[in-house]
Structures are given as C-alpha cells and as structure tokens.
C-alpha cells in the first residue's frame, strides 16, 4: 500500500478492521505514550546540541495544554502498532495486514487512527469516515482525539528526525523528513481549529 492509494478512500473500512483485530489481541509488554516520548527526545536533542526547528520550544505550552485536554477522558489502551504509514499495510485479497512492529506498544486506539490520517495526509473528511468505520459513528470527541494524536505524533517524530540527522550514517535526508512533519504540526498549532479540537476532545459523546 502507498499513501496515494490510501487517499483514494476505498481502503478505509479494511484499515479500520485491521486495527480492530490488532487492538483485540493480547497486550504488549510495554506502553507507548507520545506525551512521555516527546520530552525524552527533546532532552536528547538539547543535550547533544542537535538541530531544533525554529519556534519548536515556543509551542511547548500548547502541547502541555493539549496533553491536559487529552487526559480528561483517556481511552483504555490496547496493543497498537504505532507506526501506521501506508507502506505498513499489505493488501491480501482485500484484507489489510499490518507489518513492522518496531514501535509497537499499548496505546489508545485513536492514536492509530490519527497516525493513519497524519502519515498518509488524508483529508479531515476521510478521518471522520475512518473514525466512523472504527467506532460505528463519527463521534466528535473521537475525531478530535484522532486529529490531536496526529498532531502530537508529527510534533514528537520531528525530534526523532532531528536525532537521526545528528547520528545516522544512512544516506537519507532525516532533517527534511523532520521538517515536513514539523511544518504540518505548526500549521495545525497555529490554525483556527486547534481550540475547537481541545474543546471537542473533552466532550462526552
């Protein structure tokens, strides 16, 4: 699978099904929480003197506000892949299979949906459809939760890219990869919908 095919929209129901199958399985040994991972990555970047995007730390108060809003009605954690770029879905006769469990751990289901949305640049309407396939209807608080997890994912993985840019010998533009994530995160943090999403995620639908 690739992001272009995923954006066509006809694979959203099978993707939701594949996530539900994984989430119904046995729990992993470890948890995965981007609100805990991102500060650790930031500490490494600052300690080692790696490159940090302009204004990155300026958004930290908003990120902590985001975390507080998300903690109001946390979802029960389930076994998650946590790295749902399109290439980690394999279409087997119309059924989507998941591969690459390097970052697997127990996490909220909505993180997975937000990760799918973010990694493949789906539209907000496609995220609503994905949420509806997973939960049975496009609940406002779940849509907001998935979108905010997608935002937090981009903000956190930016630092992973910065670290790799500083230490990796691979012939890959990790900084460019990180900046693509970061610029999209900034667009959302500076955007007009951020406050509404913080409100929606605290609803009880």
Positions of predicted regions on the chain:
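ATP/Mg2+ or Mg2+-diphosphate-binding catalytic cores
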Residues: 50-54, 159-205
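Active-site catalytic-loop/activation-segment of kinase and kinase-like phosphoryl-transfer enzymes
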Residues: 34-71, 125, 180-186
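A general structural signal marking secondary-structure boundaries and capping sites
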Residues: 19-30, 70, 120, 138, ...
